[in-house]
Amino acid sequence: MNTYLDGDLIRLARRVHNTRRAYLLVNPLQGKHIPVSPGAALSMMGALGEKLALEQPGIDLVIGFAETATAVAAAAAARMGRPCHYIHTTREPGTSGESVEFREEHSHAVEQRLRLSRLRPWIDRARAIALVDDELSTGRTMVNAIRTLGEACPSIRQKPLTVASLVSRLGPDPMPALADWDIRFVSLVHRPMEDYTSAVSRYAIEPARSPEGKGLDYDEGVLPISGMDARDGVGLPEWLDALAAASDPLLEGMADGLRGKRVTVLGTEECMLPGLVFGQRLEAMGYAGRVRFHATTRSPIGVGRDEGYPIRAGWRLRSFYDAGRVTYIYNLEACDLAIVITDSRDDAATKAAMEDLTAALREAGCGAVRLIREERHVQHL
């Protein structure tokens, strides 16, 4: 199992227009705000799964937290060495069925929800449950989620719970409000709780800007993984296997155009694992000269040029899921080809988002763009 130090997983950035918390811990290996080798990102996420399996064997249900931990939790679950069910929270409205809501109190977008149609019977049958986030500071979001699940799914009170994260800043008595629950804690890195407001105040920042001019033309393709949506719940490793099986034929068909090229694979908001797996398969096949992955996000982060500051460039984009919502992409690098992988159901929002994103990619020095949408969300007219 790979080991990591806090210097491997933590960079400090300034939030924009967030009165709850002025700073953000940015993980350079997570594949969200900073381009990263897909293999390196999945190795780090897998290390958390290996640690979970070692310290808390028997987990057969994993719950991940949107937006930034959707891939973290799934990749960790897949590396635990046993089949399990996986579901992640979402900020997107549900299409049908019952769900429960809770608050992520320090976030720019505080409302989170869990869909219950599959989750409730999974909780009833589970031997042990893990709740996985990328970073835990106060633990309030996790407390809110566990309390909400306790009300909606009372059987969870009889299950051993493990709260896992890449980075934990929880203290010795992390969740006194849940003292009567059976809860354990696992993390890759532990760092004492500290307020970094003054530490980030020295950085000169400006907000991300809207791209200018016309975007690049782009080709479209389909990733055929019908019927699998982690917002509703999926099985692992089946979901990971399906993503790999769907990616390989696409990559083989693109092989001649990828040889020696610099390729950036981009996910969209909560949709991160499909792009990470696609990028990792491309990386492993050896077609491309360089593969990097990161994703769009709802998080408004300051852009700065001070030495050591992690967010060096940023663009405002319309969301792939709601054209009236603002999202962002940070640290785009020059590349020969950008491949955007999304599970958006909204054709109009996807078109609007691609207009903005391709304009940002053009400004960053990208040569060509390909959009790949998951098959279940393509409307056949």
Q: What are the residue ranges of the model-derived segments?
A:
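PRPP-associated nucleotide enzymes
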Residues: 1-381
